[in-house]
């Protein structure tokens, strides 16, 4: 319903005070549940209330004030007003107001004929209190001649829109967005204001500024900033399009804010910087035209600097980090120093890609950050890296441009929207780019391959040939062909549902590179979407000095004592023969050795041809020795490499102690002390040969193993699996490999041997045995005792729940039979084995025999098995697991001692896993408990079951050192009381005697 203010006595004659009449129309509309208050063309004079917060006119919920057009309908403050007015039109102070606004009129503050601070439009709730104004719309409104702010939506407001409006000749800012949530400024103009054109301030978030213009303002054209109070910084701000020019300070300033994007704007003719990023994080500056700024002195067109607020309200120092600047055209004025400049104040991690910079005085770019990079090539705008683990990970991206790194394990990567980079790493990975132009990167041939009997290839589920790309440049293939001589064969399945890129040439382990794409891409893949080569910079047989650029390149020194510097970019450096000096420069670089003679030393004759790496970056760079056959770090023997620090502590050597026939052995050095920093993850090693794989299909398969140790993976369908002799692993990589819903699709394992076989569930996220809920699996045996089930009672969205069937009564099945994470397994045989772990998390299985197990660094699991074993966890949080009562026992009657010894147990960090044996706690050694006993010398602590089995054997473990007063239940993984119901404690007589009575 419309309420014409003239019906309430307003005159609009430019003389009379119409405040009361207009307010009466507003109140009437509000009382009726809402409506439109209409002001015909004319000049309506208004005056303020007793307090500044009274304003002149108070707008209310569901009321919209509408005029006849900007300049036609004018609401103007009366001459001579000398008090502050916080809003000529405003919402009520301390009330939550919703669904209101104003359109098609002008507010005039009459600045020349009044005194006091006067604002034009004001709304918002009480600062710091719960509550907010909501759903506010202003369209085609002009605000002029205010001594204070023009548009000032102030404090908590949700869903504000101001569009097609103008603010000019105001004493402070033209447009303010103060603590606005989910709002929009669109197609507005702000000019000739004494301070800023647009000021986005005080915790504003999820806010869009689209196609706005600010010019001729005394301050900046647009500012995004925290403001003067110590509050949460503005974030998730998008500035898209528009123009910011001829302002006194910056064109755009982003200060104490994060996750701000400035794109597609023209910024020019401003007094200081075109754009200034000031104590902000994760700012993107994309595809703008920034030119002819620095009109008032010598400044950069774009400046990145940190902000020192240590003497301010927060007491903090805000470092500018994570700025991404790409695709901008930057042209300097006669005063412009740099196109893009970092200050030397901690500003770092800036990424500059494909910007065109010209006509600047000192240089295109000046960077100080150690981790900042610049490239002439386009980037993909990555603002975050999502990194997996050595296990089977699921990584999901957002709408941003991200890099997803699966690392080891069978990973599932989904980029979401945005231009993403997906690198599955080792393992059989499932890669989905999502929306956007995505890059699928393969970093090693062994990341995706097949053998004669099984497939370990990655699958790309949604490749878009029109915009996605596959980066194979690190693999050495030359292009498409017949699959031989370094080419890849493009092959489509018979039903046209899948396309393969494959090499038909196998490595020494029988592995052939192969990657699969869902869909038929015959005729669609080529130079536009397959990246085979990076630029090669090659030397010759002499002593060469090779220098890379900002692009990703391969530097090949060949023979001679060469000096290689990759510059910026993710480079590959291959020194070749001779004593070479290698510097990767910025970027994630790979230092590759293709032959043992590339870097070698002969200690007998004193000939040192070892290469030297000047700037290895742990966690970013890689050392590629995969072609040489080394399989890990160790003692320098048996295919391992040792780390050795020189006496000065300033150089680390990576060396093999095994000489060739000519007396030379492989060795290179790194400048600096990396002794405690380098791990297997910093190397690309050769993959050791291991168990054979039997791989099923999506159908109902019957897989029969042999006497060898095998990994058996049925895949989809209802499969029958038999391992045969040997220590076999039955692998389930998807919930739907074995499940039931209204019917059973569970796989059946016909010959599971609990003494040596295992079930690999590492890709499914289960934590262990339990009641079938909360990520656990229930262990159930049918009433006839002929079949055992491992089952989850939790269903997926399709109503499917995981279940496996095993022939026989396997009620003694325990954690030792399940692989719940994807750690590397080091397994011994039937003899007396010595197993040594690395810095990674590993599982060491001694098997039969008197074994010596050393976990090394990492959080390891040590299981000595049968025999009298010596167990050393090394550093990390280790688990010493016992899967049978005779794994560690003593027979006092016969004098037989099969007690395992743990050399370095750390209470509070390490754990002893006895959950399979039925023990429920510490005690007197009876009734399912273990007694703690210290020897007379105080040098060894025993854990003892005092109840013998039928042969007189008693379970017992020895721990080096005095732990008698340190051990408690938290150092053990015991069986729960529920789990032991109806189960006899392993190794006990079955007769319970109350020793405490």
UniProtKB/Swiss-Prot annotation:
<feature type="repeat" description="Hemolysin-type calcium-binding 5">
    <location>
        <begin position="574"/>
        <end position="591"/>
    </location>
</feature>
<dbReference type="InterPro" id="IPR011050">
    <property type="entry name" value="Pectin_lyase_fold/virulence"/>
</dbReference>
<dbReference type="InterPro" id="IPR039448">
    <property type="entry name" value="Beta_helix"/>
</dbReference>
<feature type="repeat" description="PbH1 6">
    <location>
        <begin position="280"/>
        <end position="315"/>
    </location>
</feature>
<dbReference type="InterPro" id="IPR012334">
    <property type="entry name" value="Pectin_lyas_fold"/>
</dbReference>
<feature type="repeat" description="PbH1 7">
    <location>
        <begin position="320"/>
        <end position="359"/>
    </location>
</feature>
<dbReference type="GO" id="GO:0005615">
    <property type="term" value="C:extracellular space"/>
</dbReference>
<keyword id="KW-0413">Isomerase</keyword>
<dbReference type="GO" id="GO:0005509">
    <property type="term" value="F:calcium ion binding"/>
</dbReference>
<comment type="function">
    <text>Converts beta-D-mannuronic acid (M) to alpha-L-guluronic acid (G), producing a polymer with gel-forming capacity, required for the formation of the cyst coat.</text>
</comment>
<keyword id="KW-0016">Alginate biosynthesis</keyword>
<feature type="repeat" description="Hemolysin-type calcium-binding 9">
    <location>
        <begin position="846"/>
        <end position="862"/>
    </location>
</feature>
<dbReference type="Pfam" id="PF08548">
    <property type="entry name" value="Peptidase_M10_C"/>
</dbReference>
<dbReference type="InterPro" id="IPR006633">
    <property type="entry name" value="Carb-bd_sugar_hydrolysis-dom"/>
</dbReference>
<feature type="repeat" description="PbH1 3">
    <location>
        <begin position="180"/>
        <end position="202"/>
    </location>
</feature>
<dbReference type="InterPro" id="IPR050557">
    <property type="entry name" value="RTX_toxin/Mannuronan_C5-epim"/>
</dbReference>
<feature type="repeat" description="Hemolysin-type calcium-binding 10">
    <location>
        <begin position="864"/>
        <end position="880"/>
    </location>
</feature>
<keyword id="KW-0106">Calcium</keyword>
<dbReference type="Pfam" id="PF13229">
    <property type="entry name" value="Beta_helix"/>
</dbReference>
<keyword id="KW-0964">Secreted</keyword>
<protein>
    <recommendedName>
        <fullName>Mannuronan C5-epimerase AlgE2</fullName>
        <ecNumber>5.1.3.37</ecNumber>
    </recommendedName>
</protein>
<feature type="repeat" description="Hemolysin-type calcium-binding 7">
    <location>
        <begin position="713"/>
        <end position="730"/>
    </location>
</feature>
<dbReference type="InterPro" id="IPR018511">
    <property type="entry name" value="Hemolysin-typ_Ca-bd_CS"/>
</dbReference>
<dbReference type="Pfam" id="PF00353">
    <property type="entry name" value="HemolysinCabind"/>
</dbReference>
<dbReference type="InterPro" id="IPR013858">
    <property type="entry name" value="Peptidase_M10B_C"/>
</dbReference>
<feature type="repeat" description="Hemolysin-type calcium-binding 8">
    <location>
        <begin position="828"/>
        <end position="839"/>
    </location>
</feature>
<dbReference type="GO" id="GO:0016853">
    <property type="term" value="F:isomerase activity"/>
</dbReference>
<feature type="repeat" description="PbH1 4">
    <location>
        <begin position="204"/>
        <end position="226"/>
    </location>
</feature>
<feature type="repeat" description="PbH1 1">
    <location>
        <begin position="133"/>
        <end position="155"/>
    </location>
</feature>
<dbReference type="InterPro" id="IPR006626">
    <property type="entry name" value="PbH1"/>
</dbReference>
<feature type="repeat" description="Hemolysin-type calcium-binding 1">
    <location>
        <begin position="388"/>
        <end position="403"/>
    </location>
</feature>
<feature type="repeat" description="Hemolysin-type calcium-binding 6">
    <location>
        <begin position="696"/>
        <end position="711"/>
    </location>
</feature>
<feature type="repeat" description="Hemolysin-type calcium-binding 4">
    <location>
        <begin position="557"/>
        <end position="573"/>
    </location>
</feature>
<keyword id="KW-0677">Repeat</keyword>
<comment type="similarity">
    <text>Belongs to the D-mannuronate C5-epimerase family.</text>
</comment>
<feature type="repeat" description="PbH1 2">
    <location>
        <begin position="157"/>
        <end position="179"/>
    </location>
</feature>
<feature type="repeat" description="Hemolysin-type calcium-binding 3">
    <location>
        <begin position="424"/>
        <end position="439"/>
    </location>
</feature>
<dbReference type="GO" id="GO:0042121">
    <property type="term" value="P:alginic acid biosynthetic process"/>
</dbReference>
<dbReference type="InterPro" id="IPR024535">
    <property type="entry name" value="RHGA/B-epi-like_pectate_lyase"/>
</dbReference>
<dbReference type="InterPro" id="IPR011049">
    <property type="entry name" value="Serralysin-like_metalloprot_C"/>
</dbReference>
<dbReference type="InterPro" id="IPR001343">
    <property type="entry name" value="Hemolysn_Ca-bd"/>
</dbReference>
<feature type="repeat" description="Hemolysin-type calcium-binding 2">
    <location>
        <begin position="406"/>
        <end position="422"/>
    </location>
</feature>
């Amino acid at each position: 319903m419309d309420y014409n203010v003239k019906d309430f006595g307003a005159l609009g004659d430019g003389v009379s005070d119409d405040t009361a009449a207009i307010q009466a129309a507003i109140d009437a509309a509000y009382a009726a549940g809402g409506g439109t208050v209409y002001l015909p063309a004319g000049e309506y004079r208004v005056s303020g209330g007793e307090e500044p917060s009274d304003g002149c006119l108070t707008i209310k919920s569901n009321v919209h004030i509408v005029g006849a057009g900007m300049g036609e309908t004018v609401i103007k403050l009366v001459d001579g007003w000398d008090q502050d007015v916080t809003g000529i039109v405003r919402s009520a102070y301390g009330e939550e107001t919703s669904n209101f606004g104003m359109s098609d009129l002008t507010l005039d503050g009459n600045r020349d004929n009044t005194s006091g601070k006067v604002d034009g439009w004001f709304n918002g709730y009480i600062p710091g209190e719960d509550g907010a104004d909501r759903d506010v719309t202003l369209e085609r409104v002009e605000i002029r001649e205010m001594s204070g702010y023009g548009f000032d939506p102030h404090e908590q407001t949700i869903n504000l829109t101001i569009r097609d409006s103008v603010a000019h000749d105001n004493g402070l800012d033209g447009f303010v967005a103060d603590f606005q949530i989910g709002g929009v400024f669109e197609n507005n103009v702000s000019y000739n204001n004494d301070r800023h054109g647009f000021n986005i301030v005080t915790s504003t978030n999820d806010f869009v500024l689209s196609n706005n213009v600010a010019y001729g303002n005394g301050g900046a054209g647009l500012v995004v900033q925290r403001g003067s109070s110590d509050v949460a910084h503005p974030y998730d701000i998008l500035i898209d399009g528009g123009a910011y020019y001829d302002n006194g300070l910056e064109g755009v300033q982003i200060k104490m804010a994060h996750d701000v994007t400035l794109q597609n704007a023209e910024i020019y003719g401003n007094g200081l910087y075109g754009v200034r990023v000031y104590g902000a994080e994760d700012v993107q500056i994309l595809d703008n035209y920034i030119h002819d700024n620095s009109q008032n002195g010598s400044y950069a067109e774009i400046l990145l600097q940190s902000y020192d607020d240590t003497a301010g309200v927060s007491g903090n120092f805000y470092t500018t980090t994570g700025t991404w600047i790409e695709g901008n055209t930057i042209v300097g004025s006669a005063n412009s120093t740099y196109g893009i400049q970092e200050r030397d104040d901690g500003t770092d991690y800036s990424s500059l890609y494909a910007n065109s910079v010209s006509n600047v005085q000192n240089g295109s770019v000046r960077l100080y950050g150690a981790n900042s990079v610049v490239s002439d090539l386009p980037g993909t705008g990555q603002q975050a890296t999502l990194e997996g683990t050595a296990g089977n990970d699921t990584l999901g991206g957002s709408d941003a441009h991200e890099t997803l790194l699966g690392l080891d394990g069978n990973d599932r990567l989904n980029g979401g929207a945005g231009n993403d980079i997906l690198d599955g790493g080792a393992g059989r990975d499932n890669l989905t780019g999502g929306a956007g132009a995505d890059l699928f990167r393969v970093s090693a041939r062994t990341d995706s391959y097949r053998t004669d009997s099984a497939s370990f290839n990655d699958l790309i589920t949604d490749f878009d040939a029109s915009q996605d790309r596959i980066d194979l440049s690190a693999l050495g293939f030359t292009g498409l062909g017949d699959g031989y001589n370094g080419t890849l064969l493009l092959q489509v399945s018979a039903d046209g549902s899948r396309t393969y890129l494959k090499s038909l040439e196998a490595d020494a382990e029988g592995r052939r590179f192969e990657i699969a794409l869902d869909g038929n891409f015959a005729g669609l893949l080529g130079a536009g979407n397959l990246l085979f080569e990076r630029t090669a910079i090659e030397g010759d047989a002499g002593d060469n000095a090779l220098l890379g650029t900002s692009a990703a390149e391969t530097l090949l020194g060949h023979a001679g004592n060469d000096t290689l510097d990759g510059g910026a970019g993710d480079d590959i450096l291959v020194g070749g023969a001779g004593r070479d000096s290698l510097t990767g420069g910025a970027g994630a670089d790979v230092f590759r050795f293709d032959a043992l003679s590339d870097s070698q030393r002969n200690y007998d004759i004193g000939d040192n041809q070892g290469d030297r790496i000047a700037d290895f970056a742990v966690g970013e760079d890689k050392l590629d020795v995969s072609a040489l056959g080394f399989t890990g770090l160790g003692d320098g023997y048996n295919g391992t490499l040792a780390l050795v620090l020189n006496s000065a502590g300033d150089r680390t050597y990576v060396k093999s102690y095994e000489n060739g026939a000519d007396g030379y052995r492989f060795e290179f050095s790194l400048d600096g002390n990396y002794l405690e920093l380098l791990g297997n993850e910093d190397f690309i090693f050769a993959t050791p040969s291991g168990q054979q794989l039997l791989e099923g299909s999506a159908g109902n398969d019957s897989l029969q193993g042999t006497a060898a140790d095998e990994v058996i993976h049925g895949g989809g369908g209802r499969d029958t699996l038999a391992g045969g002799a040997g220590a076999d692993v039955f692998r389930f990589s998807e919930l739907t490999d074995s499940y039931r819903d209204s019917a059973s699709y569970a796989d059946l394992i016909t010959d599971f041997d609990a003494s040596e076989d295992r079930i690999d569930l590492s890709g499914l996220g289960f934590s262990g045995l339990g009641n079938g809920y909360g990520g656990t699996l229930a262990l159930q045996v049918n009433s006839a005792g002929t079949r055992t089930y491992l089952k989850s009672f939790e269903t997926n969205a399709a109503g499917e729940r995981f279940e496996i069937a095993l022939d026989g009564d396997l009620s003694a099945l325990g954690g030792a039979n399940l692989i719940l994470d994807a750690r590397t397994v080091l397994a011994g045989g039937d003899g007396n084995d010595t197993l040594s772990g690395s810095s990674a998390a590993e599982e060491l299985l001694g098997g039969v025999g008197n074994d010596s197990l050393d976990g090394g660094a990492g959080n390891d699991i040590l299981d000595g098995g049968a025999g009298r074993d010596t167990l050393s966890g090394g550093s990390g949080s280790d688990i010493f697991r016992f899967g049978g009562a005779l794994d560690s026992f003593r027979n006092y009657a016969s004098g037989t001692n099969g007690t395992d010894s743990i050399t370095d147990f750390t209470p509070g960090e390490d754990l002893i896993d006895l959950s399979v044996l039925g023990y429920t706690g510490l005690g007197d050694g009876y009734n399912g408990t273990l007694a703690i006993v210290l020897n007379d010398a105080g040098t060894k602590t025993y854990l003892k079951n005092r109840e013998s089995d039928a042969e007189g054997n008693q379970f017992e473990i020895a721990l080096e050192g005095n732990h008698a007063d340190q051990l408690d239940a938290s150092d053990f993984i015991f069986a729960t009381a529920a789990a032991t119901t109806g189960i006899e404690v392993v190794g006990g007589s079955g007769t319970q005697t109350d020793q405490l009575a």
